[in-house]
């Protein structure tokens, strides 16, 4: 009769041992952009039509679109890295203003081809990639989710629906994404929102700033090696 409690204790101990607790220290800067100059080092996927804008403006990257948009770093990342940036969702009467979808892709790869940059910006175009994805304030600012894509499955790792983990308008958020020794983590304003130890960790791939139907800005982006 005592086997079940002992088994549960053993399982709990195994889970605790598998938690992500070490994250290294930020080291060499691999890439940084303050978006004050020409838009270089990025590949942009979105519907190019009147009213849609993805460009550097007033010292920030501006994404002002009525559909999906992804701004990819034009080079892959490998190994233990930390990505940090400031991001704001603008709600101020603009035609695309909508409080939703502060999203990020990282460690993205296309299992079928070497060229990742073949998509239109529509969200469903990315379903067949392998990647990590965080969607803060998705579904009209009702959910915040961490997913792992792979083999055609968009596995839900964790989710929040409470107001503390949803978006506020016109606020600058410090977003930090880390990949370290088989774990990935998302922090917002210094608070850890998600950690995940991946049994099949994604160790290299592309990073993308992602949104759908909104007006957002990005600033002070830095990517560092984690030692």
Predicted regions located by residue number:
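Sec-dependent signal peptide recognition
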Residues: 1-7
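Hydrophobic h-region of N-terminal signal peptides that target proteins for export
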Residues: 8-17
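Extracellular glycan-recognition regions
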Residues: 18-227
């Amino acid at each position: 009769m005592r086997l079940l409690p002992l088994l549960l204790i053993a399982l709990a101990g195994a889970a605790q041992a598998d938690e992500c607790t070490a994250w290294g220290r930020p080291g060499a800067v691999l890439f940084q952009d303050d978006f004050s100059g020409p838009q270089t080092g990025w590949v942009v996927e979105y519907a190019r039509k009147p009213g849609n804008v993805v460009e550097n403006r007033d010292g920030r990257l501006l994404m002002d679109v009525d559909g999906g948009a992804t701004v990819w770093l034009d080079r892959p990342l490998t190994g233990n890295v930390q990505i940090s940036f400031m991001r704001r969702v603008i709600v101020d009467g603009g035609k695309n203003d909508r409080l939703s979808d502060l999203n990020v892709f990282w460690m993205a790869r296309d299992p079928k081809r070497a060229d990742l940059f073949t998509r239109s910006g529509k969200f469903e175009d990315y379903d067949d990639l392998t990647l990590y994805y965080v969607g803060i304030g998705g579904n009209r600012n009702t959910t915040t989710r961490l997913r792992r894509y792979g083999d055609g499955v968009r596995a839900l790792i964790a989710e929040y629906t409470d107001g503390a983990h949803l978006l506020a308008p016109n606020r600058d958020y410090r977003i930090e994404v880390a990949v370290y020794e088989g774990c990935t983590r998302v922090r917002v304003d210094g608070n850890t929102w998600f950690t995940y130890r991946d049994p099949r960790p994604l160790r290299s791939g592309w990073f993308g700033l992602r949104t759908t139907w909104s007006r957002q800005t990005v600033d002070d982006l830095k990517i560092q090696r984690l030692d």
